[in-house]
């Protein structure tokens, strides 16, 4: 009966029983080699781990660990792997969703079945649990575990392999001159009958050669176009070999690798890491004594706050002041450790989206963070019920302080400040106007003019959801005690439409030359700009102009991507980083010269007169900027590979801006060299095309 049912399913799928049976072997000795790729993420293949380790998925490279033998028949078979031989086979540790597939001894192997799908792919299931299927659990590139066989991520395609005709790749590598941080070299793209796969090359384990086992009568192409920053690659002296039929005797090629000694891009974190955990959300700052700090999310849960554990990690330059070289960094340190499911208090579940500022006088960094277990859209401050108790998107604060005695930086434990900030958004009747919010991640701005008490004033802006609705908008906050207490900049207003940016997404602030404050908020095609003008600096009294869309009233415009970016002012030049593609790609820095007339500091005037410098043409997203110890800009941003790796690059604008002279006020007096580097005058040459 089972055989009749299986035959019917194969007919529906449009595949003959004879063809399907070609993937099965009666014994391992005369086994039919099979390559298995995911039907949804077709560039990813099923790979064996080492003996005793979980099977996994990865970009298809057609190497020995991707070649399988299905010994048995459609009613029941066991899976062996070419790299491990006949003593090991695939074993499931259970039959329920989430059960891992490991490479165990032959005696422990799990009996499996396949079920054909309407699109011609197959679900691979334990015989005792046909409702579950092998799945790239958590997404492409993750370990193989069981999940519902109805999920399309658990459907697979089979190709038989001709083991006699191989693609053999030899490697010639000259690694001298590479930056220490850039240990991944790039992807060697392999195209098999139009289907893409890749071998990722790492300088720490470059093999002498790689042997790839290909399908019968395959056409094969090879490309080295995707070298990562810091490296150059070619295949047989060219960028690529176009797809062609595999010769009878196979194909041998040479991959030549050299370090790009002119490269200045550095990967502070490749994403995902070796555990499959991604990084995201960059923030960068330069301290008073000239250290550069890079802080970002580390996401064991794989996603934003609200999905589980998220941590904050930091690296900083090992040198500062005159000794700063911009190329050497400390090892990563976790400064806020989310506890995920182990959290005994809600706010300790995770910490993410760092917003940071380094004080211009003290060797101290303030880090503000969203925290907790609530998705940003679902916070309900002021609207809790018995069925849905109040649980807003929570907020935390920590500091990183320089120990003068030890010469090291020490982070304080995070502390929750949720209920220090949310009450700012209640009106006189006690009604909450904001149900959920977080501070725009990246750089918190610090005034160079306004000092009330011991600290110069700092500014941040919040993404906020109106209580009782899903409408997001922005407000700005300021602090005169370096984040100990916060106040609303401007009036709360009566409703959503009275906010500084009624439709704004993730926002940032920057001070303009007269002390007024620019709000720059995320939107597709451009930014929302608004400006707060002071009538009294000390009491922080003043008014907002009204938000404008820069792409509608000016020339700060780009593709449809809707992505976090950052404004930064150096003297009389205003910068704005943001991706420029329709998708998240092409992170660039826009810039414009500011007039010395405060009457021009309006949202509409500030939307005009921009020019652009493209930093990357690759997939890229969020970004943050700081002024480096040498007066140039440090850009910390998200870029492929992964979604996303964290990339730092110094940008020397004296070689790229239009001809002008600008005054660069460094944010520190160097406590090491004691030279008081407070003002630098740079003459700009070599204008570029807009």
Model-derived segments and spans:
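Short, solvent-exposed S/T- and G/P-enriched segments that are highly enriched in secreted/extracellular
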Residues: 194-214, 237-248
